[in-house]
Amino acid sequence: MKKKIESYQGAAGGWGAVKSVANAVRKQMDIRHDVIAMFDMNKPEGFDCPGCAWPDPKNSASFDICENGAKAIAWEVTDKQVNASFFAENTVQSLLTWGDHELEAAGRLTQPLKYDAVSDCYKPLSWQQAFDEIGARLQSYSDPNQVEFYTSGRTSNEAAFLYQLFAREYGSNNFPDCSNMCHEPTSVGLAASIGVGKGTVLLEDFEKCDLVICIGHNPGTNHPRMLTSLRALVKRGAKMIAINPLQERGLERFTAPQNPFEMLTNSETQLASAYYNVRIGGDMALLKGMMRLLIERDDAASAAGRPSLLDDEFIQTHTVGFDELRRDVLNSEWKDIERISGLSQTQIAELADAYAAAERTIICYGMGITQHEHGTQNVQQLVNLLLMKGNIGKPGAGICPLRGHSNVQGDRTVGITEKPSAEFLARLGERYGFPPPHAPGHAAIASMQAICTGQARALICMGGNFALAMPDREASAVPLTQLDLAVHVATKLNRSHLLTARHSYILPVLGRSEIDMQKSGAQAVTVEDSMSMIHASRGVLKPAGVMLKSECAVVAGIAQAALPQSVVAWEYLVEDYDRIRNDIEAVLPEFADYNQRIRHPGGFHLINAAAERRWMTPSGKANFITSKGLLEDPSSAFNSKLVMATVRSHDQYNTTIYGMDDRYRGVFGQRDVVFMSAKQAKICRVKNGERVNLIALTPDGKRSSRRMDRLKVVIYPMADRSLVTYFPESNHMLTLDNHDPLSGIPGYKSIPVELEPSN
């Protein structure tokens, strides 16, 4: 693997994407049999992409797949297997020396496994033995709240519903979830602002908008199929403006791989009409600057007898809190706005002008907005900006959070939450005849804190790589090994499986692409995309191993063993997933006619009250919510000279690392790098390719023991006073205490650091 730093000149997509897909297929898949499955991905009669949550268009191309979706499916249907012979040759201690890419690249898990401390190896056992032993451990605990039930966003609606049902009959609301680490500020912030913790737009709204503002996200890597929608709106004359600390190729220009003309002529579409490199941690200052300019110009227009720039009728009829917001933003000083945002008043005025001129605006955002200590307030400032011009609840306008994993939103909809509503619990109890627990449980940060203090004794993970995704992983590694029980439901080996508890199990399951055969025949599961569309997913490939079970079957097996007197007919439900969906419909009325509607091509849309200007808030209206000050990360209040954000590489999805390249950013064969601007490199007196150390700072500006050594400097077009490193390698630079108090999300996107040359 050749290591190099070399500027990539191509557009997003194009022949670079085709070559990358070919390499992924060649390394992982049986080309004769498995590649054909890609033609069934994101199709009504096929399976949903196991990658991102971008919605499927109604009339999609015959090959509706993106580069990273292809990598995800190649990763899943690999011919390589991790079985008993693999573990006979590799102890857990030896595997801990492997890289995270190497661990998952070893292949698919195909047998139930139990850790044997004497040999330091995982050894196979039968499914029934695994269920019985896990059930016995769960029965032994005096308090059900000693168990943490983690969920990954790859889990289907059906499996997630059964999982929460099992945990609540067991007696716990402990539901740490991957969404706690990515879009929890969306769920909390939007619910407080507009009454619904989800986005308000549909894919069709991108066909009607005048302007799309993309802030704090990177579609070229994290949701590449979005580029097709951005290309289409630009082609018809609408504008897209990008706001991001780094210049990301997927926001700049795009060559559509499905377009023969563009591929043959090497032509491309310019996406962003303007690009603003906001400083890391400067989003709130920028947004308040925009709102201040809009209000001042609206005041001037009113004084001169000109039409209002704001939607006064909408504000008066549908909102509360505008006067308080007005006072707050008008009191924000320009010198502070410019210093914190890294943008001049002139640049912010350009943004305000573009927004004022547009009749219909969509704001799209990702974890660059949410992963801050005030991530919830960041989301609410985006809503404030939209409410000022009535851009919620009309065609071609709205808020568009870009969720990560393909069903992370659906899992929450069907009950994966540590704070369930009283109505949900009442309907669940009525359906099944048991009293669910009402006390709030643990989200991700609280669950890890419970593990670290010894309060938690067991961890069950429905997918994911919990240990690697969390902050402060060095501090949490030892407590994880001191648990009594760890159960990992998974398709691939990862580092979390190697932090073994007293009793550790790995339970292998079917992938999204594989046929799920139950007593009534082949089953479909359902997922919910970022825009609240529910659709079916049907596997088409032969399972990777004869012993694999579905997620639903695994949950039912554990539940039956742990709850021998259960009131739930677990086997009956798993025999036919229509029965699970009937129960979901009974508990959640918005799923009316569930089984009938998922059989329609494309599925159905869950009603979003805010999109219809029905405000399910205590005030009965949309709320302008003021956030005091301009800092979205109070731990940086001492005005650290350098702030670091963690990001994915292009060969990565969440904690899964498909390869060692980051093509669009020009990094190949390596991940031990730190990105900075040329101006910042000059200030720090370092050059491209030199090695440096980063030391995390405490909230009072002092050096901590958390550090990253010998990172290679990559000079890159981006904001100054900002550094970028890769997630999850840099997660340990953040403590468990560095999180948003409203949503609990870790502040991965704004870690104050100090830089020094490496010896």
UniProtKB/Swiss-Prot annotation:
The keyword Ribonucleoprotein is assigned to this record: no
Top-rank lineage group of the source organism: Bacteria
Cofactor names: [4Fe-4S] cluster; Mo-bis(molybdopterin guanine dinucleotide)
Induction: By EvgA.
Molecular function as annotated in GO: 4 iron, 4 sulfur cluster binding; formate dehydrogenase (NAD+) activity; molybdenum ion binding
Binding-site list for [4Fe-4S] cluster: 49, 52
UniProt keyword terms in alphabetical order: 4Fe-4S, Iron, Iron-sulfur, Metal-binding, Molybdenum, Oxidoreductase
Keyword Oxidoreductase: yes
GO cellular component: membrane
Family the UniProt entry places it in: Belongs to the prokaryotic molybdopterin-containing oxidoreductase family.
PANTHER family on file: PROTEIN YDEP (PTHR43105:SF4), RESPIRATORY NITRATE REDUCTASE (PTHR43105)
Protein's name according to its UniProt entry: Protein YdeP
Organism: Shigella flexneri
Gene: ydeP
